[in-house]
């Protein structure tokens, strides 16, 4: 698809939404009510209404129109057919509120232009500048708006629906490699999703962005637009306000460019004034940088934009953290990089100089050598490098290769063509067609010439994902190993326990740890304590490293820098040195009295917390079971199994001792009561298939391209892919206990007014149709809140990711409104480590040791950014290896897979393949996509691109 077609697609979609809105306004009905009544009268006729939404999608899939003439002709033909059909069907529907004259008047507007195709083109040109308000009275608009909003009648639900954006705000959007774009907010488009903003840029073009793309928001800049008296969800711009808005946008853009030129030297001084080497939190607030550059505490919008543009263009020096509410708090200084200037390399590429042609000759030879001699067998043995010493790289060739690798890594995250990669690929004889070059193809070329490994995920080598210990950055890896060895000597003697005198002896209780058999650090265990009739306490015991290590110590700083234990299929990087963790803090260490911080709750029959305690404790040696053993034990109990399994019940507990079953069943009952409380507040868990990738050998080396010769490899690792069908019963029980500890932790922090790291998830704003879909989701939850994927398809795009906050916030999917603080993994998550430190300052009555709220707020953006980066790259790596597994399947095994077709107006249709646990894109025509939306279908694999993280499927024939 070319850029012209993409441009048409975007604007025709706006056109179709505009037409649908005009119909609904004429009928004084919302789209959801109109569709329901229309479908009830004649079920097959609902497709007519869908025309308005899918017309613009025709060029997005498969058969694109050859040119604009065909595009507009097709739109016109569909609309002409719809006119008479729609009026007839409205008559048959017998809708009392339908004004047939208004409907005919609407369609007469088309006929007055004579040529429907020309009318659409004229209308398109107008809407390309801005959507003009329909001629309706204010009362009609407000009445219709009330119908659209369809406020929830769920308990306190509407109180969560606050808006961070308003009409008239100046928005700065991040466009990736294209930089930033200025726009004026015109509202929230109810025809799409509530977390999508509609805006107009300085060219007068209407565009839609997700709120996560907003880098900066300056409120009330466009006062005339702000004063427009229409609902926020009406995203059109009155014609008298439009010219002023565009003119002001251009003025702001021009002033920002002028400031960028005049303050260039001040911008560069930021690096010398604020960048302090070897400082952990090497950052500065955005407001401090503004004061430094402009010498004022109240900079103008264009001053902010000018500085922001500089920080983004110098991305090798700066990192702007995730902006939860579109207000940049911190700017982080990245370590000085060793990036070379590649101007001489680019010049040689353009001129096709002799050194460059010599490289091309070597590359052709190596491609042939690779195909003849180095075909990788699959093996579980250690992977060893095989150096091809017959070819030696010159200094120019090494630099050229570094440049090509850098460009290939950048290519893996963007679809823009790269002329230099295309040139090299073509001149070595690999470009045999006119299709665009993919990062997967170029990675294969680099593998063939011995400077890359076929199992290297390109995005893992991006600077923002550089993680010490993963093997992608030798300098960071060396620092990580050196510090681990240093701490091993530092804590050689027994560490002093600061909470020793306060610990409660709970060794009389059985403590159960439910972890995988491969887990090397046990950081939580569960006990139950019966104190009489219906008086039970559930105890969650958590490893307590902060009692022996201060958060401000070098080891605490080491944990903060690593932030989390990283679990990748080929590598695990521990937040704290593993040998120290296993010896001193893991709950399965050799000590007879394990030290823990115990979170206890007394739970009512309705699952409410009647009382809670947070105490340092001694617990007995933990009793370890795997989740699989727990699951089989729970299913073997008749009173539990009769509601969750069918067929004969296995009487055996499969490895769980009979002496332990009473406590385990009581843990099950109490955790289910706690879950019941959250279910009343609309908690849910979407039970999607989840892939788990295992590699043998599990320590797979990377080719860092730093040798003088090409390097090949002895074998390819063995990949096994295991797919879980969703949450098991055991996982639900364990998860509920951990959530309960988070609830108790939140209560403790609020009672003692402690600065803490709360976790929240915003409540989405839903229109009537999606509200109904969400109610369907809730009504199909299991007794543990699990929801099958098919019930979540239409509302899943509305759900935002969770985030960290310094004050108690609601968590949508957990059904928690009174705050939630994760606290059960201090050996694996620094935020939990921080939580334990704060609690300890209260227990020891040492308020001076408490981390102040101001310092915490200053670091939250960094923590959010780190958590997001770790989560993003973790998903990418797991998917990369899953796609490698699929790519290497024998052709005969690429058979039929199944899944539900997910259709969204903001993205191409996708499928969650149940047997593989991965999402895939599908090439399908829009009419067929809407017809099959949310239905389970059979699919075949079409193409696999692991480096780009893309899987394409087609409907099985």
UniProtKB/Swiss-Prot annotation:
Main EC class the enzyme belongs to: hydrolase
Transit peptide: 1-54
GO molecular function: exoribonuclease II activity; RNA binding
One GO cellular component, as annotated: mitochondrion
Annotated GO biological process: mitochondrial RNA 3'-end processing
Keyword RNA-binding: yes
Domain RNB intervals: 503-843
Domain of life: Eukaryota
Catalytic activity reported: Exonucleolytic cleavage in the 3'- to 5'-direction to yield nucleoside 5'-phosphates
UniProt keywords, alphabetically: Exonuclease, Hydrolase, Mitochondrion, Nuclease, RNA-binding, Transit peptide
Subcellular location per the Swiss-Prot or TrEMBL entry: Mitochondrion
Conditions for induction: Up-regulated in cells metabolizing nonfermentable carbon sources.
EC number: 3.1.13.1
Matches recorded under InterPro entries: NA-bd_OB-fold, RNase_II/R, RNR_Ribonuclease
Function: Required for intron-independent turnover and processing of mitochondrial RNA. Participates in 3'-mtRNA processing where it hydrolyzes single-stranded RNA or partially double-stranded RNA with 3'-single-stranded tails.
Family, similarity comment: Belongs to the RNR ribonuclease family.
The protein's name: Exoribonuclease II, mitochondrial
UniProt lineage: Eukaryota, Fungi, Dikarya, Ascomycota, Taphrinomycotina
Gene: rpm1
